[in-house]
Amino acid sequence: MKIGTVTGAVWSSRKAVCLSGQTFLVVQTSEGEVVAADQVGAGKGDQVLLITGECAARYCMDAPVDAVVVAIVDGTRAP
């Protein structure tokens, strides 16, 4: 899992049927920008929790996605 900040959204007029109805966000992580499928209704400026890789594809019923926003982070603290 990774934490990132939503910096924008991605729109498309046409996309694969398996992505129909999906919203995509641009998320800045410590490793750079990623495009992630949004499952929680996050918006610009929100700090979010991402799952990536094979877990992300399984979470979206094997849709061809590399990252999924699964939570909006309310706060963090050091152990």
Which residue stretches match the model-derived regions?
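C-terminal structural segments of small proteins and small subunits
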Residues: L49-P79
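Short beta-strand-to-turn element immediately C-terminal to the catalytic PLP-Schiff-base lysine
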Residues: V27-T29, I51
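Generic structural signal for buried aliphatic residues
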Residues: W11, V48-L49
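N-terminal first-folded block
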Residues: M1-V27
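Short alpha-helix capping/helix-loop boundary micro-motifs
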Residues: G32-A37
